[in-house]
């Protein structure tokens, strides 16, 4: 980790003054980089952190959406392979470094550790540690970011989650005190925070994220009593004054795009004309069409061969997903023959500003509803009705995609060069009445319904959360076992290998952690503590 801890704090893009002559030492100093001892506005550091919090999980074009089994590439030149051939993960220690610096600079500016930047720093660090631990297992945490320790020791995954939950609680407490003495609806930092959220919204985000972390610990809720997983979850739900959470989609933490300098990823990458290279995955499309889910029309277009055979664009059986088990060459041939549905070009490929699709949700209200429903189904929060939160989650997800009862919905085309295919009438009432959607009760069947609907609600948002939920619960059943998976055993991996930086600069501690967890081998098929 040596190379991560000695870099300067932040590059200043435009120098505030011009030097007209060289002075002694100038050749050793970069005038465009702030020294470690400089005072840098906390707002500037916040801007950097919020701009980089999304870790390569751009909608549609990133591999995550293939790994989550939402879409399938039938043409490697544009959308790569579908192989789950994971290797070394990236890391989030850069976020930790900047968060520590934001705390330092905020203390210089405000003279206390109860300011809003200090609170947000706790959230960013907790999120960063959980992000990496979710991928590999044990990680350096307590010693990470200490510039005097170049080879930090590893902390157990349990300790990582325990300490992250404590940091989230600290962040909530600080924000609660600030909100009591200030306007809750005031933006935290209009210049620095690219999410543009208020004090109240940030507090809701932090507590909503804590619910995500707690539900991710469901397999450890009974055999690690000291974590108090169920009690912590119940405390948030039972005390909304102390722990406010999201109440609507308007509280979603969203990353928005524009056509000028932050284009929607498909357009930014130049893939807009190539919608025909991306099919919708069978895993998600089968869940949708089986229950006459109107989100089918938002995500996909009918398989051309089904229309040629005489089916209407509103016929759910005309929507056919591609199976990732199938080798890509076969997928390509079948796609050319019109056998599969394609991603809705009108929605996801047509606008450089992403004007026709939903914004990217980093953390959202629909997920929160399903997390609460899951906890209620599991008996964590007596008195909370799982069915109510399940239905709230479904309706919130429909709202994200702007679907309303009786709406005439235009079915798009394949690549923007052809006429639209027709229209379908959105029928939410019929969808909600389907036997597979009506809540089956606080039992295993009801839990499966909650998890399936959460999975659908994650379409094109929230990064790897679909994968993590599926890894933890087995729901929905992911396609695997075929040659299209691209691993030696044609099975989906359950973790990543450790970052290359750890191998290069912290090898002794890494080897010790591997011995403790996995018998000494860094294996993508080994189960971590979180999901054993």
Predicted segments — roles?
Residues 1-31:
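Bacterial Sec-dependent N-terminal signal peptides
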Residues 7, 227-228, 381-389, 463-472, ...:
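Composition- and surface-driven signal marking solvent-exposed, interaction-prone regions
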Residues 19-29, 66-75, 133-143, 260-261, ...:
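Short, compositionally biased low-complexity segments
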Residues 22-75, 82-85, 90-93, 101, ...:
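Membrane-proximal, proline-rich intrinsically disordered regions
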Residues 70-405, 440-445, 453:
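Structured, solvent-exposed acidic/aromatic patches
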Residues 398-532:
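C-terminal functional modules
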